[in-house]
């Protein structure tokens, strides 16, 4: 009976500690680091866009009526180039989603290890 009470108390303490740890991880990564990471990526992307001029000229080529009079302007080639740019953008986003999911996957293992270490420590020191 005494062992059951101790086990119940340990379970309650573990649950409370788990909630605290989850809250800590959430505030550390999701609320603080992730928005900063996204802002950094957007800031970087602004300069990449400006350097390689990804958005402007290709769409303007298709939309601009004056380019229809250019003998060397090939509409299908411009469409292909625009398509390549959009594929690159989609690939860029998907790569980052994959990267972040890998980090989350690794963190879940790390979290489990931390919880196991903590439980072993609790069982050693308290009981």
From Swiss-Prot:
**Compartments reported by the entry:** Mitochondrion membrane
Keywords on record: Membrane, Mitochondrion, Transmembrane, Transmembrane helix
Where would you find the membrane-spanning parts of this chain?
Answer: 85-107
GO cellular component terms, semicolon-separated: mitochondrial membrane; mitochondrion
Protein topology in the membrane: Single-pass membrane protein
**Where primarily located?**
mitochondrion
Q: In the UniProt entry for this protein, what further remark is given in the free-text comments?
A: Found in a 14.5 kb cluster region located downstream from rpl11 gene and upstream of orf796.
Q: What is this protein called?
A: Uncharacterized mitochondrial protein 35
The root-end lineage is:
Eukaryota, Amoebozoa, Evosea, Eumycetozoa, Dictyostelia
